[in-house]
Amino acid sequence: MRIFVYGSLRTKQGNSHWMTNALLLGEYSIDNYQLYSLGHYPGAVPGNGTVHGEVYRIDNATLAELDALRTRGGEYARQLIQTPYGSAWMYVYQRPVEGLTLIESGNWLDRDQY
């Protein structure tokens, strides 16, 4: 299975160690989403924009670990999207974004510019 990551799980980011058993397939940008800073990590929500990230091939054990990290407390929900590498899971932020900083470029690597 595949997963699209756009923040701290990306290469050389704070939580990239969770992806050590994953195979990077390539970069991908998804339209109709906006990226917000939650502090040390981002949240993507449906909206007018594009979010940039990476697609990985992962195993069931890695997905279970990521679900435990991302979906506890209802902060994110996993959603199936289509990528050039095939369908992939994406974690979509589930809480209100009012008061959060919009990352206008849609790229978490640009977060220090906002």
Swiss-Prot record:
Tree of life domain: Bacteria
Pfam short name (any one): GGACT
Gene3D superfamilies the UniProt entry points to: Gamma-glutamyl cyclotransferase-like
A GO CC term attached to the entry: cytosol
Keyword set, alphabetical order: Cytoplasm
Similarity comment: Belongs to the gamma-glutamylcyclotransferase family.
Protein name: Gamma-glutamylcyclotransferase family protein ytfP
Protein source organism: Citrobacter rodentium (strain ICC168)
High-level lineage: Bacteria, Pseudomonadati, Pseudomonadota, Gammaproteobacteria, Enterobacterales
Gene for this chain: ytfP
